Amino acid sequence: MADLEEQLSDEEKVRIAAKFIIHAPPGEFNEVFNDVRLLLNNDNLLREGAAHAFAQYNLDQFTPVKIEGYEDQVLITEHGDLGNGKFLDPKNRICFKFDHLRKEATDPRPYEAENTVESWRTSVETALRAYVKEHYPNGVCTVYGKKIDGQQTIIACIESHQFQAKNFWNGRWRSEWKFTISPSSTQVVGILKIQVHYYEDGNVQLVSHKDIQDSLTVSNEAQTAKEFIKIVEAAENEYQTAISENYQTMSDTTFKALRRQLPVTRTKIDWNKILSYKIGKEMQNA
């Protein structure tokens, strides 16, 4: 092991450490970071070389953050990334600095985003917040409005998590929805993601995703937002139901087949008793 460690360059060590960090299960970033820190045994190398991994993890996980002085949390996503460690909170029209390692937001300042799509963004955000409040008690959503390739685009992100370290499991739901504002109708594209880690007496992870496409009728802002939420609700309910049904099927069939079956006698074998019989028989023969 020591020889292998000597053969690895600092660059290779950082690359391996970054992979561990990026793939840390939800709610377990600190544990993975601390383990990697011990293995690498070079804090400066880790902080400088793996800084991109800290950022990538937060962007991928839709990490929610609370900004001092503001009521609602905002998600850290690629859509709100303004560069140089700054992110956008479109609801409060502010930008802020975000520390990817400490997961802290600081220095909030006013920020004016795309005004041409703001009324559409606000309508979708209002409808989505009501939906999230009903379906995800601990959920957070952030809605962006921006021009992409010259088209007015709405991007809606949802995150909800349950971290139960005392019960040896953590899980996170993420969904991202996108559509352009065009006359008559448009295409809604979404991706739904579930990641759960269970680690009591074992190590089991569920990592699942589903891509969604649907048509959306575009009329006025309020009605379009309402129709958009119907698509979101139907797709997310269907996906979550399918996941639950698959787990039940696996429990009834696949996992059951893995369990050790009882012998023909339908009773468990008492190996201690069999051993004592064998010893007794050998003593008699002696």
Curated annotation (Swiss-Prot):
Superkingdom: Eukaryota
Keyword Acetylation recorded: yes
Positions carrying N-acetylalanine: 2
Residues with the Phosphoserine modification: 9
GO biological process terms on file: actin cytoskeleton organization; barbed-end actin filament capping
PROSITE patterns the UniProt entry points to: F_ACTIN_CAPPING_A_1 (PS00748), F_ACTIN_CAPPING_A_2 (PS00749)
GO cellular component, one term: F-actin capping protein complex
Entry keyword set: Acetylation, Actin capping, Actin-binding, Phosphoprotein
InterPro entries reported for this sequence: CapZ_alpha (IPR002189), CapZ_alpha/beta (IPR037282), CapZ_alpha/beta_2 (IPR042276), CapZ_alpha_1 (IPR042489), F-actin_cap_asu_CS (IPR017865)
GO molecular function, one term: actin filament binding
Pfam family, one: F-actin_cap_A
Keyword flag Transport: no
Similarity field: Belongs to the F-actin-capping protein alpha subunit family.
Subunit structure: Component of the F-actin capping complex, composed of a heterodimer of an alpha and a beta subunit. Component of the WASH complex, composed of F-actin-capping protein subunit alpha (CAPZA1, CAPZA2 or CAPZA3), F-actin-capping protein subunit beta (CAPZB), WASHC1, WASHC2, WASHC3, WASHC4 and WASHC5. Interacts with RCSD1/CAPZIP.
Protein purpose: F-actin-capping proteins bind in a Ca(2+)-independent manner to the fast growing ends of actin filaments (barbed end) thereby blocking the exchange of subunits at these ends. Unlike other capping proteins (such as gelsolin and severin), these proteins do not sever actin filaments.
Protein name: F-actin-capping protein subunit alpha-2
